[in-house]
Amino acid sequence: MGATHTIWEDLLDDTSFGLFALHCQSEDHCLAYALNAACGLSLSRTPKDLELGNCACFPVFQWKDEAHFQEWTLFRNTGLSLVAGASGGLFPDQPSEVRHYLVPERREVDYFLKVEGDEDPPGLLDRLLSIPRLVTAYRLDASGLKSKHNLIY
């Protein structure tokens, strides 16, 4: 006989991480470099991007802080995918780009910084706001997001 395994909803609703919204027009690698310098991190690009279905890929930067038992993840909120040209358009043979959002209910946010671990480091928000490339940064309540499951990497 085969065993049936179920996933408890509590595990999917686990939001025991800090989430910060970052508004920044810089490229993702430039922002990761600025975060590393300002916050003492070592974020690096993961070999594999976060894929949502077959529609879009989102770059991810990650760092595991073994000393403080924390895991830091930087997500870009927007991803582009190419779609075959629509018939009847001006350029029917050319593919067009479609913009997708990792967290669609927060389209105004450019990046998300997720901090998993015991607690956020003291003064983190002040250090984020001191980065000249950042327009603004603020803490978000992940439990209120409909698509928080997209942030599980």
Residues of each region from the PLM?
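Short, surface-exposed beta-edge/turn micro-motifs
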Residues: 16-19, 107-112
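Short N-terminal or domain-adjacent regulatory/targeting segments
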Residues: 1-8, 87-97
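Glycine-rich, aromatic-bearing surface loops/beta-hairpins
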Residues: 100, 110-153
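Aromatic- and glycine-enriched beta-alpha-beta binding-site module
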Residues: 23-63
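Short, flexible, solvent-exposed loop/turn segments with mixed acidic/basic and small polar residues
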Residues: 5-13, 97-107
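Surface-exposed, low-hydrophobicity interaction/linker segments
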Residues: 52-95
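Terminal, regulation- and interaction-focused segments at domain boundaries
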Residues: 9-26
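Short, surface-exposed beta-strand/loop "edge" segments at domain boundaries and coil↔beta transitions
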Residues: 26-33, 67-71, 119-125
